[in-house]
């Protein structure tokens, strides 16, 4: 997948315009004329040298360099942030992103336009199209639907995703090898799925049937449960998928899973993350433990998780953004970045279910 942007006028073009204006000056004295011609020649040679040095850089790097020059002259970078929905994980990623950009560029040199799509894909599209119309310098797409909308809205403005699980799946890239190319890069919240399956075995070696609860409208959730299901079956478990279309049927589907299964696994899923109270209200009274794909879900309804820090994920994304805006990096050449994982458990829910965390787990704070 390659995305190209139109280049800016070359340095030679600019020098030619300078030369034209100098030649238009009516200089009568021969000595002054020679000085003027010498000046023209010097400017042209310098411009040609600069063009030769920068000829291999892509148009995205050139655009980023010009944005950096503008900010140095007192113009703020305009950064649009499209966040799919409000919940702890995405909120932390946005904060980490903003903090990193302020640290890297100076708070006075960056202006954020934050928009919450309220978990609506149509709103994601509207937000990103507005960013393009407003001429922002960079777009942060927080969560998969936000990234998909940003990719559809522009092939020119640099787009960074965060809280995106699998970029190949999200963008329909059959040949994805770690770098998207074009105007898109970012960070992934994909945890090691084989280790998540192994964590279920670590906590519940005697369980027989594992329910995989997820939103069918989120392709990254489908990807996760497919992989985890295969890993669980390798470990000898019966693994069954329970999909809900949206928050309206989550309660009924979760009730079915809790009635049928010994343990429930919930992947990194935006709809589940926004509705952990529903899941906890069903599973905890039923005595069915939940293993979660990320810390925000585990904090709301889970026993344990193989967790990443979404704040750190967002901060890494912000550091990438600073490099793009200042011309230090070309977004088309930046690979997707990942973060480290930590084993964590929910002390309150473990106490309620009479569970003791295995060695090596850290209690979730708050």
Placement of each model-derived feature along the sequence:
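Sec-dependent N-terminal signal peptides of Gram-positive bacterial secreted proteins and lipoproteins
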Residues: 35-56
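Flexible loop/turn connectors
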Residues: 296-348
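Bacterial lipoprotein signal-peptidase II cleavage site
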Residues: 50-69
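Hydrophobic alpha-helical segments within soluble ligand-binding/sensing domains
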Residues: 73, 167-209, 308-329
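Beta-alpha junction/loop-to-helix N-cap segments that form part of ligand/metal-binding clefts
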Residues: 113-175, 266-284, 288-293
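Pocket-lining segment of extracytoplasmic ligand-binding domains
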Residues: 219-288, 294
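Extracytoplasmic "Venus flytrap"
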Residues: 74-98, 104, 113-124, 217-221, ...
């Amino acid at each position: 997948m390659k995305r190209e942007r139109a280049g800016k006028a070359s340095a030679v073009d600019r020098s030619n315009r300078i030369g034209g204006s100098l030649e238009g000056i009516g200089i009568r004295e021969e000595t002054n004329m020679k000085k003027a011609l010498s000046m023209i020649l010097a400017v042209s040679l310098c411009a040609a040298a600069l063009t030769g040095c920068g000829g291999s850089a892509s148009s995205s790097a050139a655009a980023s360099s010009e944005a950096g020059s503008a900010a140095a002259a007192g113009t703020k970078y305009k950064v649009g942030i499209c966040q799919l929905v409000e919940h702890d994980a995405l909120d932390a990623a946005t904060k980490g992103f903003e903090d990193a950009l302020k640290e890297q560029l100076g708070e006075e040199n960056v202006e954020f336009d934050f928009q919450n799509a309220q978990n609506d894909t149509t709103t994601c599209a509207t937000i990103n199209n507005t960013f393009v119309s407003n001429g922002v310098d960079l777009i942060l797409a927080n969560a998969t639907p936000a990234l998909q909308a940003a990719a559809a809205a522009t092939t020119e403005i640099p787009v960074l995703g965060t809280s995106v699980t699998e970029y190949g799946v999200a963008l329909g890239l059959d040949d994805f090898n770690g770098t998207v190319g074009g105007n898109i890069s970012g960070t992934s919240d994909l945890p090691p799925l084989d280790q998540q399956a192994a964590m279920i075995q670590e906590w519940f070696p005697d369980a027989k049937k594992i329910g995989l609860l997820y939103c069918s409208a989120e392709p990254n959730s489908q990807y996760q449960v497919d992989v985890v299901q295969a890993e669980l079956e390798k470990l000898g478990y019966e693994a069954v998928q329970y999909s809900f279309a949206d928050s309206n049927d989550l309660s009924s589907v979760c009730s079915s899973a809790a009635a049928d299964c010994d343990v429930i696994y919930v992947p990194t899923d935006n709809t589940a993350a926004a509705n952990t109270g529903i899941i906890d209200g069903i599973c905890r009274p039923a005595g069915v433990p939940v293993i979660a794909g990320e810390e925000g879900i585990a904090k709301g309804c889970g026993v344990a998780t193989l967790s990443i820090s979404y704040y750190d994920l967002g901060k890494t994304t912000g550091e990438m953004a600073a490099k793009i805006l200042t011309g230090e990096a070309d977004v088309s050449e930046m690979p997707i970045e990942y973060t480290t994982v930590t084993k964590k458990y929910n002390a309150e829910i473990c106490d309620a279910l009479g569970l003791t965390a295995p060695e090596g787990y850290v209690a979730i704070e708050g």
